[in-house]
């Protein structure tokens, strides 16, 4: 009993012999069961084709990032803008409330002293305009002096050689003279403007001095009100400048957002245009036509040319008629026309002329014997075929 093994069910099986029940239990498993969860079919569906992978433009991701950044910046800056506007309105309301309270306590002295503080404001503005006019006048004087120096250099170059006149120095002299005239006009204009604003500033200062002497008592009593008003005015100007800056940032962010959207639209149009330009199906390799043969019609498939292409089309058309009694008259006429066209192409071929023997018969019997072996399959389908004779 050394050649027997003890089976799991108590049976003894000779060595080297398989148990039938084990083979039955371990039957062949289907390939679908080996793939967990049917991942084989899903992977082919979710995987992008090479054509789709080629159409993915990297500029899309870049423009989407710009779009997201601009959107986040717009949201953040708009929140800051709303907060700044709320703060500005709150300060404006508080300043108006405090000023009204202060004005009710002081009484009529505020209205009496108001011309004095208005004159001070105008005098301050006139003083600032005077400073700006002085800067413009100084700039015009500097330009005039530089232009005069250029004219002097050009005159020295022209007078260096008295025997001949250099056109380069002459052109430089003319240009320098024009600059001197323009600088002189600008200097005179700046001088007149400076004199005008200086007179206005002097008049404003004189008015301030006169009102200060006349309204000395009302000015002293209303000083707290106007000082508080000046403080609130400065605070409001700062918040107004902040609001204006935030509005400009929002406008710039919205401009970048619009540019990113426009770029995405252009990329999308380019992709659609490229898709419309591609063929719907990739064309396979085409076989070349025989030497001397013309290209077949568009209706014939790639690779079907000459006699084989025409006869192949005839066989397929004849086989599609089904197991009926036979093709009708129109079908036979079409097949005959295709056969004649293929024979004409064959006879026009240079290779065919080289293959013909010198003793070929004029009635085409030898040609018919050669082509009978290739056309034997469709003799039953197409009853009578025309024999075309070849004349050399």
Curated annotation (Swiss-Prot):
Modified sites of kind Phosphoserine: 30, 49, 342, 349, 357, 361, 377
Modification Phosphothreonine occurs at: 13
User: Biased-composition ranges for Low complexity?
Assistant: 317-332
Under Gene Ontology molecular function, one entry of this record is:
guanyl-nucleotide exchange factor activity
Record's compositionally biased regions (Basic residues): 383-392
Q: Which domain of life is it from?
A: Eukaryota
Biased amino acid composition, Basic and acidic residues: 18-28
Q: Which residues form a coiled coil?
A: 59-140, 169-272
InterPro entries from the entry?
SH3BP5
Region feature Disordered, mapped onto this chain: 1-57, 275-332, 364-392
Q: Please indicate if the UniProt record lists 4Fe-4S as a keyword.
A: no
Q: Which GO terms describe its biological process?
A: intracellular signal transduction
Entry keyword set: Coiled coil, Guanine-nucleotide releasing factor, Phosphoprotein
Q: Which family does it belong to?
A: Belongs to the SH3BP5 family.
Q: What does this protein do?
A: Functions as a guanine nucleotide exchange factor (GEF) for RAB11A.
Record protein name field: SH3 domain-binding protein 5-like
Q: Which organism is it from?
A: Mus musculus (Mouse)
Q: The organism's lineage?
A: Eukaryota, Metazoa, Chordata, Craniata, Vertebrata
């Amino acid at each position: 009993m050394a050649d027997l093994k003890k089976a799991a069910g108590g049976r003894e099986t000779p060595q080297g012999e398989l148990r039938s029940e084990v083979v039955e239990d371990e039957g062949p498993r289907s390939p679908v069961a080996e793939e967990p969860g049917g991942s084989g079919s899903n992977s082919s569906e979710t995987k992008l084709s090479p054509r789709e992978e080629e159409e993915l433009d990297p500029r899309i991701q870049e423009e989407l990032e710009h779009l997201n950044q601009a959107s986040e910046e717009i949201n953040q800056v708009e929140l800051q803008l709303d907060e700044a506007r709320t703060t500005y309105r709150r300060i404006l309301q508080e300043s108006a409330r405090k000023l009204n309270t202060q004005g009710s306590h002081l009484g009529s002295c505020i209205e009496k002293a108001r011309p004095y503080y208005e004159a001070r404001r105008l005098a301050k503005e006139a003083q600032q305009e005077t400073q700006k006019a002085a800067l413009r006048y100084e700039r015009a004087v500097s330009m005039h002096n530089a232009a005069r120096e250029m004219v002097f250099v050009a005159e020295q170059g022209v007078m260096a050689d008295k025997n001949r006149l250099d056109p380069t120095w002459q052109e430089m002299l003319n240009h320098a003279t024009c600059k001197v005239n323009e600088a002189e006009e600008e200097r005179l204009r700046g001088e007149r403007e400076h004199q005008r604003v200086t007179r206005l500033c002097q008049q404003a200062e004189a008015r301030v001095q006169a009102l200060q002497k006349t309204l000395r008592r009302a000015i002293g009593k209303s000083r707290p009100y106007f000082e508080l008003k000046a403080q609130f005015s400065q605070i409001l100007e700062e918040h107004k400048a902040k609001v204006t800056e935030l509005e400009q940032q929002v406008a710039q962010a919205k401009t970048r957002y619009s540019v990113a959207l426009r770029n995405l639209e252009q990329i999308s149009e380019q992709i659609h245009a490229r898709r419309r330009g591609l063929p719907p199906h990739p064309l396979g390799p085409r076989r070349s036509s025989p030497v001397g043969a013309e290209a077949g019609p568009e209706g014939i498939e790639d690779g079907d040319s000459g006699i084989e292409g025409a006869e192949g089309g005839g066989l397929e058309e004849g086989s599609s008629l089904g197991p009926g009694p036979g093709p009708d008259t129109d079908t036979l006429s079409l097949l005959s026309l295709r056969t004649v066209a293929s024979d004409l192409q064959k006879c026009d071929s240079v290779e065919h002329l080289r293959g013909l023997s010198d003793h070929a018969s004029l009635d085409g019997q030898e040609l018919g014997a050669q082509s009978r072996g290739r056309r034997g399959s469709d003799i039953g389908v197409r009853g009578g075929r025309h024999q075309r004779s070849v004349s050399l």
